[in-house]
Amino acid sequence: MVTLMNTYGDMFRVTVFGESHGKAVGAVVDGCPANLPLSEEDIQKELDRRRPGQSIFSTPRKEEDKVEILSGIFEGKTTGAPICSIVYNKNMRPKDYSKIKDTPRPGHADLTYRLKYKNYDYRGGGRASGRVTIGHVIGGAIAKKLLSYTYNIKIIGYTIKIGKIEGDFSYYKNPEVFENEKSLERLIEIIESNPLRCPSMNEKEMEEYVLKAMENKDSVGGVVEIVALNVPVGVGNPIFNKLNGELARALMSINAVKGVEIGAGFKAAEMYGSEMNDEMYFDDDKNIRFKTNNCGGILGGISCGTPIVLRIAVKPTPSIGKKQKTINLKTLENVEIEIEGRHDPVIVPRIVPVAEAMVAITLADLMIKGGFIHPCSL
């Protein structure tokens, strides 16, 4: 298993690089088989989904996030060589962070990075910034293309809760939406046209919740649900390399994610076994079917053929306008801090494409390791 702290994956490996206010960010993807049709447009459309400044609910930092592929592509297809992609930072304002050099911001990684590494790029959070997830999305875009090309796998994420406001749409409330192509296309249209990436009818109530927090110089969190469709039976391994364990590890690598649920999740603790168990039957063509999907597409750490259903808890953006108490590491005094800069009042909608990316990278890695996808050439 790869243990490098900036690399994720064993066979399909994604190494992310760069800092929030450095020259550039990006990713190197190693282990993608040759002959996969891939273009900068395939990556750009995913990056555009996480790009800042697209609504009043995201940071006003203006970045075009234009990707450039430097290697690994020839005549429109992958060669099997490492795919290096870079995005240059354009709208940096490092002076916004000069006041926090010695005063770690509550809720951020400032303190732990400073104590561990001593020489820490504190500008905008450096390596701990959400901007670094551009690398995740680059890797995820390539993984998505690979999964779609080989198995028609679709990965769809959306917001189901903002703060205390729970939406009326989710996989378990509306499973029929995921059963045909037309309803899926319509769902994606609704998600992508909404500033919170929420397909619920009560989404406006969520918007008001965020606006109220903004008025109070505060921020909010929420819950994102991710559904992976058409994943074949047999992906994953028992015991220590379970599919659910690998997916949870991948999703927990995303900044601001504080919890992961799979299938019925924590509600399973409230259910009877007779309610939780997904009963099986043969359809008319003798295919194995399940009456329910409380397992979330995974049994014993291995995919069972039903949709894989995951949810992540996203904490409120830690950068807020309110005065907060902290410490000065240089003077050893207790001080107050008022954070300047450009920040998201809610990070939830921009985490959606990042979460999809990490699910895709995990599935691609496990499917290459498991023999579902040839490691050298398609």
UniProtKB/Swiss-Prot annotation:
Pathway: Metabolic intermediate biosynthesis; chorismate biosynthesis; chorismate from D-erythrose 4-phosphate and phosphoenolpyruvate: step 7/7. GO terms for molecular function: chorismate synthase activity; FMN binding. This is Chorismate synthase. One of its GO terms (cellular component) is cytosol. The gene is aroC. The keyword Nucleotidyltransferase does not apply. Its cofactor is FMNH2. Belongs to the chorismate synthase family.
